[in-house]
C-alpha cells in the first residue's frame, strides 16, 4: 500500500480483514474512509475491541465477499491479504473478479497477497488456489494492469517456509 499514492479520503476496503492490524495502520496514517469485510463476526468484534473508540471510524461488513452487496465504483483500493486463495472453484473466482471490478472506481487499485504457485496447497486445513504473477493477472482480465508483483517467503511459527505472491493491479479499462 505505501507504493500507491492515495489521498486520505480515498475509499479503501480490506477483504477478509478480520483481526488484521491493517485497519489500525490506515487509521494512524490518517485515512478517513475504511471498510473491513469478513465472514467472521467474531474476528471483526476483536478488531473493534482492539481499536476502541476509533472503531466507529470504520465501516464493518459481516459477510461472504461472494454474496455481499457492495457499492458500485466506490473503492479506490481493494485490499485482500488472505481471502482469494481460498477460492478454489473457478466460478467463485469469476464472481470475486466481478465484485472487484464492479466496486472499484476507474483507476482504482487491487492489492492482493496469495499463495505462490510453489506455496502450500492447504491453509488452516482448507485447500487453497495457488498463483503465479501470470495466472493471477489472467484472473482479473484485460482491463486490469499489473503495477508490481513479487514472490516472497514467510516462516511460520512452526519453522515451515511458505511462498507467497503479492501483486498490485490497477483498473485501466472500462468496467465490465
Language-model segments: residues:
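Class I (Rossmann-like) S-adenosyl-L-methionine-dependent methyltransferase catalytic domain
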Residues: 1-73, 87-103, 108-176
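A conserved beta-strand element that flanks and buttresses the S-adenosyl-L-methionine
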Residues: 79
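Short catalytic micro-motifs in class I SAM-dependent methyltransferases
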Residues: 82-86
